[in-house]
Amino acid sequence: MNKKILATAVLGTGALSTLFAHQAEASTTHTVRSGESLWSISHHYGITVSKLKSLNGLSSNLIFPNQVLKVSGSSNYSSRSNYGNSSSTYTVRAGDSLSSIASRYGTTYRHIMNLNGLNSFLIFPGQQLKVSGSVSSNSHSSYNSNSGGSSSTYTVRYGDSLSSIASRYGTTYQHIMRLNGLNNFFIYPGQKLRVSGSASSNTYSTRSAQSTYYSSPVFNHRNLYDWGQCTWHVFNRRAAIGKGISTYWWNANNWDNAAARDGYRIDGNPTVGSIAQSDAGYYGHVAFVERVNSNGSILVSEMNFSASPGILTYRTIPAYQVRNYKFIH
């Protein structure tokens, strides 16, 4: 009888040891849930945000649901100068950013931009990106000085940039910008671009005078806005262009007042990178201005407007509706 009890006790001790070992092993990673931040995860595991970022090679505070993070152990991201020679591609999903993709593949967003000839942070769901390999020398081929006399157009496809299109047609991205009256590098799939010919003198519309020397405040908070909401998206887009905003402006209908208190310029003139803000609805709405068109309309990116939270969408706001918004610069 005593032997049986002793055997059971030994067996129980062994089972508990195995259980604790599995629990310890399981606790080395954490799957991000909706609403979590690096701060809340690091606090839960008793480590610092810096340590958590180091363990996962994160260059920003951006994380996304279902992302698997290391929460203990040593960092494998100490040396990243060599990204390997094998080529690999990734299909962009809603909510992705260059930083989050780079983190997943153990590289940097700059390397991905170089691999794909990107000259802005804008990516689209369904877009194919190279995430490893070497930057091919022909992606930086020299441009021909002859832009041709006949007019020609090109339809933008996923992954295109002004530089890659210019290289294909033997011209420069500056010439394409002049031909199409572009004042920034933003282009989108399906857009028609002139790629040869002469720029007409009326290509550039007269814009209202704005201060060239305005410099908005910059915050470096973590994103505490609810995941997938319009406020969450705009916070991330501003951070991506180096113009971080406060994480304490609360609902969108309070953003204009809160931004003004923090020293931001608020007016009715949209500019690329500004925040379109509206008090309409119970919580209001904010969107990120991606492009200001020559006809006065604007293209914005947003979440939780015409789709579910977390789904990135684009919308053109007609010129006659632009006056319904305030713009935070």
From Swiss-Prot:
It comes from Staphylococcus haemolyticus (strain JCSC1435). Residues 28-71, 88-131, 152-195 form the LysM domain. GO terms for cellular component: cell surface; extracellular region. This is N-acetylmuramoyl-L-alanine amidase sle1. It is an enzyme of class 3 (hydrolase). SMART domains: LysM (SM00257). CDD domains: LysM. InterPro entries: CHAP_dom, LysM_dom, LysM_dom_sf, Papain-like_cys_pep_sf. Its EC number is 3.5.1.28. GO terms for biological process: cell wall organization; defense response to bacterium; division septum assembly; killing of cells of another organism. It catalyses: Hydrolyzes the link between N-acetylmuramoyl residues and L-amino acid residues in certain cell-wall glycopeptides. The lineage of its organism: Bacteria, Bacillati, Bacillota, Bacilli, Bacillales. Peptidoglycan hydrolase involved in the splitting of the septum during cell division. Residues 205-329 form the Peptidase C51 domain. The keyword Repeat applies.
